[in-house]
Amino acid sequence: MPSVRSVTCCCLLWMMLSVQLVTPGSPATAQLSGQRTARGPGSAICNMACRLGQGHMYPFCNCNGKRDVVSSSMAV
């Protein structure tokens, strides 16, 4: 079974490669393929990293307040 780190790396690599890059100075912005909204690759990478609990590996991501808190004890 693949480790969480290798799965995370593969997902992030796939997302980075799926971004259509444009030349600097072009009036267009980078867009995720198949979408019309102008979003840079950083937001998609940060969302994925924060969801997987790996946001600390990317200094440009701010995952504060995005973590789901799971308690190991049951409420009585």
From Swiss-Prot:
One of its GO terms (molecular function) is potassium channel regulator activity. Its main location: secreted. GO terms for cellular component: extracellular region; host cell postsynaptic membrane. The modification Asparagine amide is found at residue 64. It comes from the Eukaryota. The keyword Disulfide bond applies. Expressed by the venom duct. Residues 28-39, 65-76 form a propeptide. It comes from Conus planorbis. Keywords: Acetylcholine receptor inhibiting toxin, Amidation, Disulfide bond, Ion channel impairing toxin, Neurotoxin, Postsynaptic neurotoxin, Potassium channel impairing toxin, Secreted, Signal, Toxin, Voltage-gated potassium channel impairing toxin. Disulfide bonds join 46-61, 50-63. Highly inhibits both nicotinic acetylcholine receptors (neuronal (alpha-3/beta-4) and muscular (alpha-1/beta-1/epsilon/delta) subtypes) and the voltage-gated potassium channel Kv1.6/KCNA6 subtype. This is Alpha/kappa-conotoxin-like pl14.1. Residues 1-27 form the signal peptide. The cysteine framework is XIV (C-C-C-C). The keyword Disulfide bond applies. It is found in: Secreted. Belongs to the conotoxin J superfamily.
